[in-house]
Amino acid sequence: MTSQQAEQEIRQRETRRFEALVRGDMASLEEIMADDAIYTHATGVVETKAEYLAKMKSGEVRYESFAPEQLQVRIYGTAAVLTGIASVTAHVGGEVRNLRLRFTDVYVKQGDRWRMVAWQSTRLP
């Protein structure tokens, strides 16, 4: 697989992940995120994959929209670093949050699939 093909596959998986967040598609998120994935929120809260998905399953967190822009993908062998900006509307604990985030996302090739292993976001003013 060329780096251009890998980049295209990673972009497709990341788009699918953002869409799954909005749809609440747990099966897709389970498959895209590695079992040991770490999710660092803009608030500084760090969650495991299980903790993050549990909040979505319970309805404590629900994404209304997740729109990425300026997505860049850099591939380093079997790892890829994604950066970009996202406009997000989320319902958290009954409160609506409209956020603009700068993010870094890391994917690693595990077997024949690229899996998300880390996410970190920072709130933009």
Q: What label would you give each PLM region?
A:
Residues 1-125:
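A beta-strand edge to alpha-helix "cap/lid" segment located at domain peripheries
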